[in-house]
Amino acid sequence: MIISASTDYRAAAQRKLPPFLFHYADGGAYAEHTLRHNVSDLASIALRQRVLNNMSELSLSTRLFDETLSMPVALAPVGLTGMYARRGEVQAARAAAAHGIPFTMSTVSVCPIEEVAPAIDRPMWFQLYVLKDRGFMRNALERAKAAGVKTLVFTVDMPVPGARYRDAHSGMSGKNGPLRRVLQAMTHPEWAWDVGVMGRPHDLGNISKYRGNPTGLADYIGWLGNNFDPSISWKDLEWIREYWDGPMIIKGILDADDARDAVKFGADGIVVSNHGGRQLDGVLSSARALPAIADAVKGDLKILADSGIRSGLDVVRMIALGADTVLIGRAFLYALAVHGQAGVKNLLELFEKEMRVAMVLTGAKSISEITRDSLVRELGA
């Protein structure tokens, strides 16, 4: 199997994973228009090639919240990562730490905070949802701090779960879902042994630690469905600040007015994100939303972006549009599913190589030199 780009990992992951898991990661909301536009809008952005600039010295490193990153990339929070490889959160975190970038742990990870944090030699980030069960939120924050987490990623674009039609077709949800998942596992023996058997326990570790009992996939779906909180407002985030005094990033911003509100609230950063096209179909792609948001709040807080990033070239595009750092989700998850920690390591090396080529050929010797002047054409131009 030849792996030369993240798209190769996607194809290999589709062969290796049971369909319910592949499509859970790969799918989006409703008819998946936004999911597709996340990728196509980035691809339509033309870079400005510059030559003869003596690019013998090049630096991809950047600073973010008193951390030095080897490149402006972090691994995004992805629920159920531990179902894609044996103890997947640990493997992904180790690959990220070895490359000198942050790993963001999802609230709904398979491995608990206490298993992942000691496995790496740099602080990880922790992602938290807005939930009705404030006791769980408080418990998660306390455990994150105790584990040495410095940065909180607070996801605000899930007051209700998105309508993901693919999940019903694949067996992730819907009629006879449990039976279909078992049958699919039986026809994917490599995954069934490595993850299904050797990757146990299949609890949602952070939730099980709080509830005091094993929480499997069916419980995960039911518990989350009952705990999303549509009543959340900016005032509720003040409650979070009572329990978290470190850097806080608000994830799920697509509008400049919301970005300005994040500044007023005192957020340290935002993630320009449509949840990978998994929440509301028909909203702007992150690439389309980013320039106006950067114009509104650049310099007032750190701007991160995700959704649709499939290569180091896409990272350069997002930085040129106004991001300080990007998050990658599906790309690392596919690599993890195929080759575990080694796959994520290789993917990050591919991203770095692609970034270096793009920077050399656009004349940017450092991340700070990647600006809108690096673009020939922005979206809609």
Swiss-Prot record:
<feature type="binding site">
    <location>
        <position position="24"/>
    </location>
    <ligand>
        <name>substrate</name>
    </ligand>
</feature>
<feature type="binding site">
    <location>
        <position position="278"/>
    </location>
    <ligand>
        <name>substrate</name>
    </ligand>
</feature>
<keyword id="KW-1003">Cell membrane</keyword>
<dbReference type="InterPro" id="IPR012133">
    <property type="entry name" value="Alpha-hydoxy_acid_DH_FMN"/>
</dbReference>
<dbReference type="GO" id="GO:0009060">
    <property type="term" value="P:aerobic respiration"/>
</dbReference>
<feature type="binding site">
    <location>
        <begin position="306"/>
        <end position="330"/>
    </location>
    <ligand>
        <name>FMN</name>
    </ligand>
</feature>
<dbReference type="GO" id="GO:0005886">
    <property type="term" value="C:plasma membrane"/>
</dbReference>
<dbReference type="InterPro" id="IPR000262">
    <property type="entry name" value="FMN-dep_DH"/>
</dbReference>
<keyword id="KW-0472">Membrane</keyword>
<dbReference type="Pfam" id="PF01070">
    <property type="entry name" value="FMN_dh"/>
</dbReference>
<dbReference type="GO" id="GO:0004459">
    <property type="term" value="F:L-lactate dehydrogenase activity"/>
</dbReference>
<feature type="binding site">
    <location>
        <position position="106"/>
    </location>
    <ligand>
        <name>FMN</name>
    </ligand>
</feature>
<feature type="binding site">
    <location>
        <position position="164"/>
    </location>
    <ligand>
        <name>substrate</name>
    </ligand>
</feature>
<dbReference type="InterPro" id="IPR008259">
    <property type="entry name" value="FMN_hydac_DH_AS"/>
</dbReference>
<protein>
    <recommendedName>
        <fullName>L-lactate dehydrogenase</fullName>
        <ecNumber>1.1.-.-</ecNumber>
    </recommendedName>
</protein>
<feature type="binding site">
    <location>
        <position position="251"/>
    </location>
    <ligand>
        <name>FMN</name>
    </ligand>
</feature>
<feature type="binding site">
    <location>
        <position position="127"/>
    </location>
    <ligand>
        <name>FMN</name>
    </ligand>
</feature>
<dbReference type="GO" id="GO:0006089">
    <property type="term" value="P:lactate metabolic process"/>
</dbReference>
<comment type="function">
    <text>Catalyzes the conversion of L-lactate to pyruvate. Is coupled to the respiratory chain.</text>
</comment>
<keyword id="KW-0288">FMN</keyword>
<dbReference type="GO" id="GO:0010181">
    <property type="term" value="F:FMN binding"/>
</dbReference>
<keyword id="KW-0560">Oxidoreductase</keyword>
<dbReference type="InterPro" id="IPR013785">
    <property type="entry name" value="Aldolase_TIM"/>
</dbReference>
<keyword id="KW-0285">Flavoprotein</keyword>
<feature type="active site" description="Proton acceptor">
    <location>
        <position position="275"/>
    </location>
</feature>
<feature type="binding site">
    <location>
        <position position="129"/>
    </location>
    <ligand>
        <name>substrate</name>
    </ligand>
</feature>
<comment type="similarity">
    <text>Belongs to the FMN-dependent alpha-hydroxy acid dehydrogenase family.</text>
</comment>
<feature type="domain" description="FMN hydroxy acid dehydrogenase">
    <location>
        <begin position="1"/>
        <end position="380"/>
    </location>
</feature>
<feature type="binding site">
    <location>
        <position position="155"/>
    </location>
    <ligand>
        <name>FMN</name>
    </ligand>
</feature>
<dbReference type="InterPro" id="IPR037396">
    <property type="entry name" value="FMN_HAD"/>
</dbReference>
<comment type="subunit">
    <text>Homotetramer.</text>
</comment>
<keyword id="KW-0997">Cell inner membrane</keyword>
<dbReference type="InterPro" id="IPR020920">
    <property type="entry name" value="LldD"/>
</dbReference>
